[in-house]
Amino acid sequence: GSGKSTLFKLICGLYQPSEGTVRIFGRAPESIPEEERRKVFGLVEQQFKPVSGNMRDQITLSDPSIFEKDVRRALAETGILPAIEDLPEGLDTPYDPGLLSQGQFQLLSIARATVTNPPLLLLDEITANLDSVTEKQVLDALRAASVKRTVLSISHRLFEAAGGRQVRIGH
């Protein structure tokens, strides 16, 4: 490849550069404490990665410092709040992979990434496995989530549809 995923791993502090430096808001990413990283950047990956617990835990990752109002704001911002409220126990519904469609889980991923209101949003092929109707829903949610944030995206199609400045790396 051309290093797109490596670039994200450098930004997230998972890799250290062999030459030069990486700075996120003036700080080396690897120096940002784990508990603070979600407040600096939100990461949305191609596949939703569930955690044990209920639907609230899927957003908060069991972080007690995240308030209910923040969870609801993130869900409303992405348009997935009505679907969550329709679940038998709402946010308290135990996680099950059959509860939502693949596209709805991508919306949940965006809510997870934005619940702490980070200034940087990293998107890794988030529309790659979606049909065109679901892709439009995800892109609409992304437009809302992108307000007042810097967005870096690895995608073959995303910014063509979403509108935005492009920096191309590789093919």
Segments the model singles out, each with a brief description of its role:
Residues 141-155, 159-163:
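Conserved catalytic loops of ABC-family nucleotide-binding domains
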Residues 121-125:
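Catalytic Walker B motif of ABC-type/P-loop ATPase nucleotide-binding domains
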Residues 12:
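Helix-to-loop junction immediately C-terminal to a conserved catalytic motif
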Residues 20-28, 37:
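Conserved ABC transporter NBD signature motif
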Residues 48-94:
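Conserved "ABC signature" C-loop
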Residues 2-3:
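Walker A (P-loop) phosphate-binding loop of ABC-type ATPase nucleotide-binding domains
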Residues 117:
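Conserved catalytic motifs of ABC-family nucleotide-binding domains
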